[in-house]
Amino acid sequence: MTPKPRVSGRYTAGIQKRRKPNPDQRRRELCDAAIQLLADDGAKGLSHLKVDARAGVPDGTTSFYFRTRSALLHAVAERMVELDLAILQGVADSPGPAGGASASTLAKVVIQTGEEPQLSRTRARYELTMQATRDPAIGATLQRATDAFTKLHHDILVQLLPHGADLAPEVVDDLSNITLTFINGLLLRFAHGDRIIESPEQVDGVLSAIVAGVLGSDQQGGLTHDGAALQPRRKRATPTR
């Protein structure tokens, strides 16, 4: 008898199952698992084997892609920067609220950072920030992200503010620095489980109040630009008769 030919579809399926995963995709998956571990267990709870278990891959997979714990942390920092920049760039590219009928995209993104799955990344980011104080390379990665975030936030603010493009650069610097400081503080409270603000509309309300306060200050343009806010304004000397 002539032997039956092998069923090509079944054979191909078997080959596909044994095919190695895309290395870049596997690295992203491992980094995402590590981010979740950082959020749940902190930096002390991060190890290659725990990442393997969280990602559902065979033992030794993480150490194959990232030989040392330092290499793993650096890759996680890069992955987090990649994810965060993509979200913030989406805010910069989006239109503002139409006619004041809805909250700004920026406010919506801020609230989303306090909700899963982004809440885990918020917590992991603070864990990495602490690691950066002892690892200059991680610090440099996070600083690049911070610089990019600051510029994007600056551009978003100009876009959202009425007549934002007409404001003096130093005034926009003040507004950007102060609102970004508020947002960073809010994210820290979210990371601790403190939902002091619940809705995008509340975020917009606070940001609007901050903007109004800065624009109404006789020190606008010097509140953060050159540290003027830390220096009490000198009183003019009263002329003696």
Regions found by a protein language model. Give the residues of each.
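Helix-turn-helix
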Residues: R26-E29, A33-A71, A75
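Hydrophobic alpha-helical connector segments
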Residues: A75, A86-T122, V172-T179
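Amphipathic alpha-helical segments used for helix-helix packing
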Residues: A103, P117-A140
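Hydrophobic/aromatic-rich alpha-helical bundle segments in the mid-to-C-terminal region
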Residues: I138-Q143, L160-R241
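Short, solvent-exposed amphipathic helices
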Residues: T141-L152
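N-terminal intrinsically disordered/low-complexity leader segments
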Residues: M1-Q25, D218-R241
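Residues in soluble alpha-helical coiled-coils and helical-bundle/repeat scaffolds
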Residues: R67-A71, P97, E116, T133, ...
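Short, basic, alpha-helical segments at the C-terminal edge of helix-turn-helix-like DNA-binding modules
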Residues: E78-D84
